């Protein structure tokens, strides 16, 4: 399996954010996501909160899909 952490950095402008709650500001409770350059269907997720600055997770599309479907099912959410 390709080591996603060896691929180039994601530019800040490439991130899209998904927000909810907004505990302390406009983008305080967001998860940002962007495609990883040089990879097919790989993504970087990061925390938008100041305390989470610099914390990043790289995952494949299959890993994100599995998480999203499992999370929605566990929480009783409809897709």
What do these predicted ranges mean?
Residues 1-24:
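Negatively charged, low-complexity tracts enriched in Asp/Glu with abundant Ser/Thr
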Residues 17-69:
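A short, structured beta-strand/loop element
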Residues 70-75:
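A short alpha-helix/helix-coil micro-patch that ends at or immediately precedes a cysteine
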């Amino acid at each position: 399996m390709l080591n996603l952490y060896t691929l180039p950095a994601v530019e800040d402008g490439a991130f899209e954010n998904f927000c909810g709650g907004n505990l302390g500001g406009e983008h305080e409770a967001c998860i940002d996501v962007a495609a990883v350059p040089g990879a097919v269907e790989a993504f970087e997720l990061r925390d938008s909160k100041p305390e989470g600055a610099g914390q990043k997770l790289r995952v494949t599309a299959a890993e994100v899909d599995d998480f999203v479907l499992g999370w929605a099912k566990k929480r009783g959410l409809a897709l």
